[in-house]
């Protein structure tokens, strides 16, 4: 395992944002803008690249990192700092302690989530379903209506 081979404290795999699959959830911190900016290209000859921040979805962290945050900074590791989310806040603390993080960018994971699905009466011709004749009543105007829905 790379974490052991290179004696690293933090290693993340690579995965994409749920809503932007073309953007990886790994960042470098831009000191000028004070923003975490996504990394879009990786050196194909390297197993690992240093990162400033990453999502926690494929993250390996040594226990000693959490212990140092609590004992040296007196803060919970993932407590939000200002407008930053939990993940960026965690990595801001590790940078403050001089702990480097790396991305094993060839280790890729999927970003799980949920998707709201709404019914659509406009079925494609390839949809397999059974047509039923039903009788209904009521319209949005309050008038009675009878008919069949196919």
Task: Name the predicted role of every residue range.
Residues 1-77:
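Conserved catalytic core of nucleotide-sugar-dependent glycosyltransferases
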Residues 63-64, 68-150:
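C-terminal catalytic/acceptor-binding lobe
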């Amino acid at each position: 395992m790379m974490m052991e081979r290179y004696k690293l404290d933090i290693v993340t795999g690579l995965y994409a944002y749920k809503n932007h699959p073309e953007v990886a959830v790994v960042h470098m911190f831009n000191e000028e803008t004070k923003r975490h900016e996504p990394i879009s290209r990786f050196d194909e000859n390297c197993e690992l690249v240093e990162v400033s921040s990453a999502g926690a979805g494929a993250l390996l962290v040594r226990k000693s990192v959490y212990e140092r945050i609590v004992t040296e900074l007196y803060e919970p590791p993932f407590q939000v700092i200002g407008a930053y989310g939990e993940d960026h806040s965690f990595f801001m603390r590790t940078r403050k302690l001089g702990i480097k993080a790396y991305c094993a960018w060839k280790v890729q994971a999927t970003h799980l989530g949920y998707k709201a699905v709404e019914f659509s009466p406009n079925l494609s011709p390839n949809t397999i379903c059974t047509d039923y004749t039903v009788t209904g009543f009521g319209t949005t105007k309050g008038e009675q209506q009878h008919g069949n829905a196919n």
